[in-house]
UniProtKB/Swiss-Prot annotation:
Alphabetized SMART domains for the sequence: H3
Keywords from the named record: Acetylation, Chromosome, DNA-binding, Methylation, Nucleosome core, Nucleus, Phosphoprotein
Main subcellular location: nucleus
Gene designation per UniProt: H3a
Protein name as catalogued: Histone H3.3 type a
Modified residues (Phosphoserine): 11
Role played: Core component of nucleosome. Nucleosomes wrap and compact DNA into chromatin, limiting DNA accessibility to the cellular machineries which require DNA as a template. Histones thereby play a central role in transcription regulation, DNA repair, DNA replication and chromosomal stability. DNA accessibility is regulated via a complex set of post-translational modifications of histones, also called histone code, and nucleosome remodeling.
Protein family: Belongs to the histone H3 family.
Statement: the UniProt record of this protein carries the keyword Phosphoprotein: yes
Post-translational modification N6-acetyllysine, affected residues: 5, 10, 15, 19, 24, 28, 40, 60
Modification after translation, per record: Acetylation is generally linked to gene activation.
Basic residues composition bias: residue spans: 16-27
Length: 139
């Protein structure tokens, strides 16, 4: 199929009323060709735009990033290996979650710095290893 130039169309700004079709069967029988302009193209943002928006959103917020119940299940599962039938106060699990999220955010910040130092924008496992090694957590 040959390429053709598309001309800009002016928008009226008002919503066009839809044609009411009696049943789903009638809708399936009427083919809509893509060349007639009946099918609307799905809007997609450029790569990285949504990521930057999410970064700004999470930097503004102070709420917890991990959902509470999955974190609670993880804590109970890990504690089960040391002693069975342990009970936790909700404040204790909240404190564990605050501390672990603060640790992970700090680790990812250091990991990002390691990736930037290597002239990359993508973090890799070796960046995490280097960040932990510099911190003195792992030799």
């Amino acid at each position: 199929m040959a390429r053709t130039k598309q001309t800009a169309r002016k928008s009226t700004g008002a919503k066009v009323p839809r044609k009411h079709i009696g049943s789903k069967q009638a809708h399936k029988q009427t083919p809509v060709s893509s060349s007639s302009g009946g099918v609307k193209k799905v809007h997609r943002f450029r790569p990285g735009t949504v990521a930057l928006r999410e970064i700004r959103k999470y930097q503004k917020s102070t709420d917890l990033l991990i959902r509470k119940l999955p974190f609670q299940r993880l804590v109970r599962e890990i504690a089960q290996e040391f002693k069975t039938d342990l009970r936790f106060q909700s404040a204790a699990i909240g404190a564990l979650q605050e501390a672990s999220e603060a640790y992970l955010v700090g680790l990812f910040e250091d990991t990002n710095l390691c990736a930037i130092h290597a002239k990359r924008v993508t973090i890799m496992p070796k960046d995490i290893h280097l960040a932990r090694r510099i911190r003195g957590e792992r030799s």
